[in-house]
Amino acid sequence: MKAKELREKSVEELNAELLNLLREQFNLRMQAASGQLQQTHLLKQVRRDVARVKTLLTQKAGA
């Protein structure tokens, strides 16, 4: 997800997005551990999306 799209969301929407991303990350890690994950780049992509959302939440809390 693009940072520009995330900046337009409210804090509640960002928290919901963070929860969805963390669930997706968990599912991807389980697939990777069991050898079922074919697209390993998704782990890195989701990890960075989580970081983007957490960064924006921190910025909005300070503002």
Swiss-Prot record:
Keywords from UniProt, A to Z, are: Ribonucleoprotein, Ribosomal protein
Gene Ontology cellular-component annotations? cytosolic large ribosomal subunit
A GO MF annotation of the entry reads:
structural constituent of ribosome
**Which is one Pfam family of this protein?**
Ribosomal_L29
Choose any GO biological process term that the UniProt entry carries and state it.
translation
| NCBIfam families tied to this protein | L29
Quote the PANTHER family the UniProt record gives. 60S RIBOSOMAL PROTEIN L35/50S RIBOSOMAL PROTEIN L29, LARGE RIBOSOMAL SUBUNIT PROTEIN UL29C
Q: Which family does it belong to?
A: Belongs to the universal ribosomal protein uL29 family.
* Protein known as: Large ribosomal subunit protein uL29
- Which species is this record about? Klebsiella pneumoniae subsp. pneumoniae (strain ATCC 700721 / MGH 78578)
Top-down, what is the taxonomic lineage of the species of origin?
Answer: Bacteria, Pseudomonadati, Pseudomonadota, Gammaproteobacteria, Enterobacterales
